[in-house]
From Swiss-Prot:
Lineage of the species this protein comes from: Eukaryota, Viridiplantae, Streptophyta, Embryophyta, Tracheophyta
Disulfide topology: none
Other remarks in the entry: Plants overexpressing TSPO show increased sensitivity to ABA and salt stress. Cultured cells overexpressing TSPO have reduced greening and chlorophyll a content under light-growing conditions.
Name by which UniProt lists this protein: Translocator protein homolog
Signal peptide feature range: none
Effect of a null allele: No visible phenotype under normal growth conditions.
Keywords from the named record: Chloroplast, Endoplasmic reticulum, Golgi apparatus, Membrane, Plastid, Stress response, Transmembrane, Transmembrane helix, Transport
Functional description taken from the UniProt entry: Stress-induced membrane protein that can bind heme and may play a role in the transport of tetrapyrrole intermediates during salt stress and contribute to the detoxification of highly reactive porphyrins in the cytoplasm.
Membrane topology according to the record: Multi-pass membrane protein
Subcellular location: Endoplasmic reticulum membrane; Golgi apparatus membrane; Plastid, Chloroplast membrane
Keyword Plastid on entry: yes
């Protein structure tokens, strides 16, 4: 009879342990579902902010290019040299550069970099505004020298962005590198346009 009591008590403990484990697993599954829902909601917010961060600079650049557009003088000056790209390629690459800078700025923002280093935000805004001003000054007004001055300021702000972004997020810093290369090429185009 003692052995029956032991088995019975063991079975009762086993049932209680099984019930407790099942309850723990259920709570864990509920917690995981809640965490999964939280992560999904956070990912949706992140995707929305990424879309805005990339699309806004591209759309503003497109707007400035279209409405503040260019005059016919670029075509005449560009024909004087074979290495100067056509205007549509110049504008398309400026749009891509704006998108890359928007993505880099978003990566810095996600890491809280604009709070840690507010100068990074000021440099980003300065390079973006100077990029917007460059097209009308160089092409609409037709001043190659003033355009070169604006572009050199934009390039300096871009280099400052590279240094600041690279300290916060190396990936963001690497995204600025193609923009720096493009800025150097456009500076060379500006010199040619200023001389021509």
């Amino acid at each position: 009879m003692d052995s029956q009591d032991i088995r019975y008590r063991g079975g009762d403990d086993r049932d209680a342990a099984t019930t407790a484990m099942a309850e723990t697993e259920r709570k864990s599954a509920d917690d995981n579902k809640g965490k999964r829902d939280q992560k999904r909601a956070m990912a949706k917010r992140g995707l929305k902010s990424l879309t805005v961060a990339v699309a806004a600079p591209v759309l503003v650049t497109l707007f400035a290019t279209y409405f503040l557009g260019t005059s016919d003088g670029y075509g005449n000056r560009a024909k004087s040299s074979s290495w100067i790209p056509p205007l549509w390629l110049l504008h398309t690459t400026c749009l891509a550069s704006s998108g890359l800078m928007g993505l880099a700025a978003w990566l810095v923002w996600v890491d809280g970099g604009f709070h840690k280093k507010p100068n990074a935000l000021y440099l980003y805004l300065a390079q973006f505004l100077l990029c917007l001003v460059w097209d009308p000054v160089t092409f609409r007004v037709g001043s190659g020298v003033a355009g070169l001055a604006v572009w050199l300021g934009q390039s300096a702000a871009l280099f400052g962005c590279y240094k600041a972004f690279n300290e916060i997020s190396p990936v963001a810093g690497n995204l600025v590198k193609p923009c720096l290369a493009w800025a150097a090429f456009v500076a060379a185009v500006n010199v040619k346009l200023a001389v021509a």
